[in-house]
Amino acid sequence: MNFTLIVCTYMRPIPLLDLLNSVKSQTIYPNEILIIDGSTNNETEAILENNKFQNLQYFEVPNEHRGLTKQRNYGIARVGDITDVICFLDDDTILEPTYFEEIINTFHYDDEIVGVAGVAINEMRWIKKETNKKYSKYQFYEFEGYVYPEGARNILRNILGLQSNLGPGRMPEFSNGRTCGFPLNEKIYEVDLLIGMSFSFRKVVFDNIKFSHYFEGYGLYEDADFSIRAQQFGKNVITTKAKLLHYHDPSGRPNQYQYGKMVVRNGWYVWRVKYPNPSLKAKFKWNVIVILLTFIRFSNIFTTSKRQEAFTETMGRIVGWLSLSFNKPKR
C-alpha cells in the first residue's frame, strides 16, 4: 500500500526537522513527503536544503493558499497517482518508530476503514483501575479496566446530567462528546471524530471531498468536520498502536476574543454537519453546555493569572452564541 505524508507548516523549522528525523526512523517509509510551507521567511526551506530526506518535495505556498485548510487542500492536489493513503501530521509532533506501520496495518485490517488516527502518548491521563477501589462517577470516567480523571468542566457536566453516554470520539446528538481519547491497550476503536494532528484517509475520500472552505484561516474544528463527512465512505477508527508525541505550539492562534467566537460558531457548524435536524432536547443541551463552559471560562478571570485572556475569550463566546440567533454559519 503506497502512502503520502503531508505536513502543513508555518514558521516552525526546528520542530519540523525533529518530526522529519522521526519519519526517517520509521519501520516503513512514505512513498512521498510533501511539505506545504506557509511561512513568510525562507528558514524552513533553508533547513530542508541542509537536511535531505528521501522522497521529500517542498512547496512554498503563495499568500492566497496560506492557512491550514487551504494548505491541506493545496497538498492533496499535488499527491501522486500511485498513492493509496494520505497521512497528515502536525509539524509539532514526533513519531514512535512503528507509527506508519501501525496506520497502514489498520487499513489492511478492514477494507471498510477509510480514516485512521493515532494517539499522543504524552497526553495520556488514563490510569489502570484498582480492583478494590471505588471511583466517583462524577470525578472519573471508567472504561475497559481503566479510569480517566475528569476535569472541572466534565465534573460539572456529570453532575448536571449533560455528559455523553457514548464512548470517546463519538458525537452525541447534542454534539459535546468525550474528548479523553483511549487508554494505551493496543486496541482499535471506531469513532466519529479524528484529530488533525495525526489522521490518515484513503485517497478515495479525497477524490470526492476536500477540507471545507468555511474553516479557512485558523481552522478550528476543521478536522472534526472532515472526519464526519468522510464517514459517508466508510468507518473512522483510532488505533492505540500508532503512537506519537504532540507538543502543542500556541503560535498561530487568533486573539482570544476571535478564538472564543470560533469555539461557539464553529462548534455549532460541525454539530449541524453531523445532526442537521437535532431534537428539541438536543438543542437545549447544546445551549446549556455553551452557557456552562462560558461561565467556567469567565471564572478563570478570578482563578488564573491570565485574566485578560479569560475575559476576552468569555466575551467572544458570548458574542458568538448570541450571533447564532440572527447569523447562523452556512455550509
Give residue spans per PLM region.
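A recurrent flexible, glycine/aromatic-enriched loop bordering the glycosyltransferase active site
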Residues: 158-171, 181-200, 231, 253
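A conserved acidic beta->alpha catalytic loop
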Residues: 29, 35-46, 93-95
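Active-site-adjacent helix/loop segment of glycosyltransferases
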Residues: 236-309
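Glycine-rich, basic loop-to-helix element that forms the pyrophosphate-binding segment
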Residues: 62-81
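A short, conserved alpha-helix in the catalytic core of glycosyltransferases
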Residues: 185-186, 192-209, 216-242
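Short beta-strand-to-loop acidic/aromatic patch adjacent to the donor-nucleotide binding site
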Residues: 82-94
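Conserved donor NDP-sugar-binding/catalytic core segment of glycosyltransferases
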Residues: 98-166
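Short, well-formed alpha-helical segments that are part of the catalytic scaffolds
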Residues: 12-26
